[in-house]
């Protein structure tokens, strides 16, 4: 397994490869949210997905879905370049002395001993949870109705499955860069799908019914680049440069 991250590009061979544009990069932008306007768009998208489409949360008059964890979270979004539409969003919730991570509170409701989940051995400065990943229905479907087909080319539609993957790449490159451990409450099929994309994790507690059977998974601190297809590597490079390299530039300014 090659474990590579840093300046330049990821490569399955362990070498710095020449930059090449992914199809995803051609049509979509990924970025860390740093302004209130974009954050409200993220909350609006979450309301559309979690409240209106899936019914996981109650409908709110404001049309915004947010909670007490958002004030101590880093938010990422994917934007469709041509239209400016938010195609996906996700957050990284950080732990604190005052408030535990969302999944730990959930497990306590199921009377599971969360103290058995020992994170000290990870030697991480902090821990976080990947949550509230939201991709609206028009970007989740591979087969669109005639009306939506007028808005997207066939090549753009082929990129739709990459949106969720790019958001996970963004979260985990951020965590690796800042030496933060990351959990997520996931269905087993999502954990398997992420593994194919080079994102490995292991389950740290039992499955429970929570909008489907889900369990907390702890992500590996490295990407398994030998399992990633060339197009996925290009997306990973693009995400790293968009999220981490851009943050380095802002910090240095």
Question: Which residues does each PLM region occupy?
Answer:
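Short amphipathic alpha-helix that is part of the acyltransferase structural core
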Residues: 16-64, 71, 75-82, 86, ...
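An N-terminal domain-start capping segment
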Residues: 1, 86-105
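Accessory, usually C-terminal, subdomains that scaffold auxiliary metal cofactors
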Residues: 198-252
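Short loop segments at secondary-structure junctions
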Residues: 81-83, 138, 220-225
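Beta-rich nucleic-acid/ligand-interaction surfaces
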Residues: 62-69, 189-193
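Acyl-donor binding region in acyl/amide transferases
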Residues: 97-218
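A short beta-turn/loop motif at secondary-structure boundaries
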Residues: 65-70, 207-211
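Short acidic N-proximal helix/loop "leader" segments that mark the beginning
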Residues: 1-25
């Amino acid at each position: 397994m090659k474990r590579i991250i840093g300046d330049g590009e990821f490569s399955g061979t362990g070498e710095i490869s020449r930059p090449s544009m992914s199809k995803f990069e051609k049509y979509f932008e990924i970025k860390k949210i740093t302004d209130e306007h974009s954050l409200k768009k993220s909350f609006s998208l979450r309301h559309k997905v979690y409240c209106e489409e899936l019914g996981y949360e109650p409908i709110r008059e404001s049309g915004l879905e947010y909670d007490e964890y958002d004030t101590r979270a880093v938010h990422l979004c994917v934007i469709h370049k041509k239209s400016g539409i938010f195609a996906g969003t996700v957050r990284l919730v950080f732990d604190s002395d005052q408030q535990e991570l969302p999944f730990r509170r959930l497990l306590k409701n199921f009377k599971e001993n969360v103290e058995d989940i020992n994170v000290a051995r990870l030697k991480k400065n902090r821990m976080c949870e990947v949550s509230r990943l939201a991709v609206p229905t028009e970007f989740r479907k591979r087969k669109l109705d005639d009306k939506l087909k007028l808005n997207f080319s066939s090549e753009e539609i082929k990129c739709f499955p990459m949106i969720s993957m790019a958001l996970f790449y963004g979260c985990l490159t951020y965590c690796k860069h800042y030496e933060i451990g990351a959990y997520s409450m996931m269905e087993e099929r999502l954990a398997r799908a992420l593994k194919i994309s080079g994102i490995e994790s292991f389950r740290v507690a039992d499955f429970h019914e929570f909008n489907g059977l889900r369990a907390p998974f702890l992500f590996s601190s490295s990407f398994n680049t030998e399992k990633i297809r060339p197009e996925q590597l290009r997306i990973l490079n693009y995400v790293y440069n968009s999220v981490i390299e851009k943050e380095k530039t802002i910090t240095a300014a």
